[in-house]
Amino acid sequence: RAYGETYGIPYVVTNCSNNYGQNQFPEKLVPLFINNIVEEKPLPVYGDGQYTRDWLYVVDHARAIDLVYHEGENGETYNIGGFNEWTNLDLIKVLCTQMDEKLGREKGSSEKLITYVKDRPGHDRRYAIDATKINKELGWAPSVTFEEGLSITIDWYLSNAKWLKN
């Protein structure tokens, strides 16, 4: 923004909510927990697990950036969110259910891996973004539901286990 204003260069700014999808760093929640479920390792949940996050499938994020780049108003800021808030615990339970189905495990077996751990100091209870502006002004909304995106993501990680390890 400052560079654009200083030098008179056209610009738009985007801010986003939590992304998930293929090729995400293995230490992030979704790929970490996919790997831990495969290996039947604990699923560490901070505090009470009621922290809320807005989740956005990475392909929807890329489409939104493309739209803002081509259709956004010069100098404007657009928040890109999933309109999709989940508590960490609920997200983990959905992930466990899908993983049990995909791995042919007994329903509920992965949920037994959930382990509550001491919370981080200053941990934010909610990370979410108001994406109303991009929706109203540019007509953008996510095209992939959370469950669909999670299923695609799980399939990718299960098919690319070597990548996850390296």
Where are these regions (language model features)?
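Short, charge-rich amphipathic segments
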Residues: 1-3, 29, 88
